[in-house]
Curated annotation (Swiss-Prot):
Residues 261-271, 287-312, 574-591, 607-622 have a biased composition (Polar residues). InterPro entries: ARM-like, ARM-type_fold, CLASP_N_dom, TOG. The gene is STU1. It holds the Pfam family CLASP_N. Keywords: Cell cycle, Cell division, Cytoplasm, Cytoskeleton, Microtubule, Mitosis, Nucleus, Repeat. SUPFAM superfamilies: ARM repeat. Interacts with microtubules. Microtubule binding protein that promotes the stabilization of dynamic microtubules. Required for mitotic spindle formation. This is Protein STU1. Gene3D superfamilies: Leucine-rich Repeat Variant. It comes from the Eukaryota.
Amino acid sequence: MDARATELLATLRNGNVSVDVKTTSLAKLKSEIKQKHVPDAAISPLFESFRLAIASQHYSLSSAGFSALGHLLKRLTLQEQHEAIALQGRATYQLLLERLGDHKERIRSQAAQAFTDFWPAASADVEHHVLGAALIGKNARAKETSMVWLAKMTREYGLLFRIYVPALVTCLEDADGVVRDTAKSTVIELFQSAPPRAISDLKKQLIQNNVRKSIATSILSSLGANIVADSETSSSFQSQSRSDITRPATSFSHRREEVPRSQSVLSMRSHSNADVHNIPKIDAAFKSQSKPTRSGHSSKDPTLSHTASSESLPAPRQDTTDGEGVEPLYINSHREFDDTIREMLPHFEGKESEQNWILREKSIMTLRRLTKGNAPHDYQQYYLAGIKSVLDGILKTANSLRTTLSAAGCYLLQDIARTCGPAIDPMVEILLQSLIKLSAALKKITAQNGNVTVDVIIGNVSYTARILQHIWGACQDKNVQPRQFATGWIKTIIIRQGKHKGSIEHSGGLDLIEKCIKKGLGDPNPGVREGMRGTFWAFYSVWPERADVIMSALEPKSKNLLERDPNNTHRGVASQSFDGSRGSQPHSTKSSLKEAINAQKKARLAASSNVPSRPESAQSSFPDPKSGRPAPRRPTGTSTIRVPTGEKLSQSASLSSAPMRPASRPRRPELVRPATADPYSSRRSAAPTAQSKASSPSDSPQKSKSKLMTTPRSRNPLARPKSRMDNAANVTNDKQRADPAATLAPKMRRRGPSEPDVVSAAARARIAILSPSRTEGDFSVASSQVKIDQKAEEAFQGTPTRGIENGTPLPASPLRSPLKGAFSTPTRNRKSSDGAPPSRIPISPSYSSRRSSEEPMLPRTPLDSRRSRGESDEAASQIPAPVDQSPIIDAINSQSPGILKVYEDPQSPHSKHSIVLGDTVPKTPGSQAKVMPLEELPLNESTTVPNRKHNQLPEHTPLLQPSPILTPSSENSHRRWKKVEGSERRRSLSPRSKDPVKAQDMITRGLARIRTGALDVHGYRKFQNLIKYHESISKDDTKYEDILMALLEALEKPDGDKGAPSGRSLDLKTQVLVTIRLMLVINREAFAAFYPRVMTAIITARKQYELTNHIVSGLEETAEDIVSACNPPQVIDAILDLLETEERSFESYRMVAMGSYILSGLLRRLNNQKLYLSQAELERLGKFANENLRSTQPDVRRAIIDFCPELYDMVQSEDAFWSMVNSSVEDFRPLLTYYIMRRPEKIG
């Protein structure tokens, strides 16, 4: 071979030899190289010969040279002569670079392949020549070929391309169009599977090199990222309307107060303090006020998690607008955030000038976008440190004379306060000093922005005494604006800290608040006085005694204006209280007081004689007008309370010597708002009368307002252990309220040694039947006789009963036989008014399985524990104190001595008679049963329908383990949902609606309005009553399907009217959901066919609402019902079909998170039943998990992490599971392994 190599070299150098001869000689030697060993002496002549051939201008000879060179390099590689390859390559690279820029594509590709063949032996040299010379050279063809080569080497050999990204980005702006297109495709290919950090660096490179927007957008959209040019980050803010500036102070800081909610059932929060929209409730007075929103900035981002102190509360959020929305900016590392802060620091140095104010505005907008993004949550420590470093610049911006720049700074501070909450406590001092001074600015817009910012900060950070000291300083300011704004700030603190009065009282803040209120009520400016009046009544709701002292010290004119203030919802109580205090004055006598009382009595009696007729849909009878307002709360166990009427006390004014104007036309006392029509009726409670021996089970008669009554405070003797679904029982301090949406299956207490084993005859005497005049949601006064229907008797025959006190099994009555699949509803006991100890009642097997751990009979299912969250308003069952025997007892005792039977509501269309526990109230002339809004529910609902409110399940329902869809829910939101759902039961039906023919016509017309979206809230409620009353509707499969499909479409439909108040559309959607749940209850068999469709509608509807909306609890509850009863494979396919086709958006992550938790619950159910899915379904689930593990939303990632352990159990094969779920780009194996192994069953 040595001789043939030398001969070939001579042939190629001879110019007289034809090209064909040279090509033939080269081909022969190539064949020999492929088959034989190449000696060392022949290496140099061969390389020289091939270089001559490649350099030839003849295509055939050049192509043959490339081919022979490739075979030679492969042969030498097999012979492991890498040093010889590297040595000869140094003399070959320049020639290959020239050919890399050849105008023929074939030659360029062969040259690139030659570099590829050299790369294993001399990678550094090859990269230097191709990527360090050709890529940055001037030859466009060489650039194009080198980029293609880079993509190929990265794909096949794992070449690290990071250091060549700047050169690639430079090529994106090359003058040659082909180079630009190749560069774009190369960048997309290289970064297609790159980590987020690399994509972030690419964004910076694109911005630094000023790559045209079309190219950058195309690249980033292909990579799933986005970019916003710096020029677009600065935006001018819309000025606030003049009406917002000139409004009186009473319009500021009137926010509703609500209990902070915990986490949701299906959608867990990212942080413990996330997204609390409202503040805790203080008094029912604030519930009936309409509260105007304040101008400012709205935020929908969750707040920071933090360690809450005893004085701190979750950060509330206001529904305000700043004129323009801000697009969130997401970062991938804390270093990226630090770099951003470092770049904007120079812009805030020195004074504001024409050169730097635009840069400052851009920086503020960038900080707002970062605050809206993931920086405060994922990198909290670095975010707070960065904000602290630029805080001085932010305050400079807020105090700028440029209105736009000042507004931007204020909006940023509001965003920070809402997002971080108590985490910014160390900065509050300096912020309040600057912003209170800003609120005194001459520019109304600037002053208003300062006011709103101070209010937002106060409403979101932890309370300290220094905050009140700053407000006290504002109350003493010489400018009117800070004094006027201070009224709203004080009210915010009172409302927010109302449930935690100790933090204010123990720090001396109460004295400061009193000083502020006194100074405000006596301020020379009428606007300040008007604003402070509203603050005074908020103060009155929390500290009524201290407020009485302040009010008694006012002048008569000021006191009169204060009592007539619109914010005064305690007018009756306050007027009477102060009238009583005036009664001790010398000019007030007992005779005048008696005359006033007698005149009021006569007026009431005369008015009650001519009571106008009322429509049945409102209320069939009028309640006593004395129950119009609740009695005020007192801290002692028994309190003396004046019961007010709803009318204005014209005679009360005569008790004072002050001259009074003639009163306006008085309200008719008999037209008190009925309980069924009062939207706030569910929030009011009436204190039971202790002296009454026989009273209604829901309320007791009250004395006239002229007399004093003593109301003992009843306590809850038996507390149910908290489930993980609820964190606190919804029981007021005054009395226990019955939640109309849920009937508790209470934990029975142990029998004392002196208590009997059976219900005494006197206790059994307190049984009443439902009055025919009442609707199926209420109790009423009992008649004196009971007729027990034979059918109702047979329905309960043979049901095993337990001892009344000790819960031991008793022999079944021969007249009773078990009902298959039916569950009797547990009754409720109430504590008697005279304090008699409670007695037990018979309970069903399903009820006994949920008794306390001290009396175990059946194992409590995990599903039972998760069902208990709506039952926190109920106390342990008790029987009232005994009264005289009645014929009712004889009827009961004749059937089964020692056993208390409970039947269904006689007014219900599904039953004949009903016997319930209650007090017998003897009717006297001139008195009637009062219909109070908070009353007991009927004890027995349909026994053929499993009732989630009683923790009952069908016998065939498997026991489920706690599922991720049952994570702790928001107490406040769930309570509101329960109130909404339960309130739909307290409605009567008109005679026209009871006619089946007319009802069918109304159903048809209502269905048409549902489809067009024209049905209002009251229409939905009437529609629900029609469905509940007429069984024929639920039994007609066609009609049932039409109604259900229309309701599901209405539930999925997004809110189209953006200009309307959000509460109206939310109320409509709530009624739609209540109607769907009603369809589920009345016909579960027909509803079961639509489980997949209903589940997809629920997930689609979840997309439209924040986690804090109470409708979310209803959606989650409905999903739980379906999970426990459906065919899992069908529902899984429906959910995956929905989520796989859903377009990714900012709101769609809510659907994905909820769907993931539902899938987790379905898989858990299958795993517990030892049922497995097909391979195709498992692959779909694995693909779903793999795609969403890389989601940018923390809620989605958390849901998928909870979903993966259930999928792991379902797949069974560990290798198959990791091949489905794990990603080649990012290894999730350690994270998922941790969560799989930390489960209780694995640890145990």
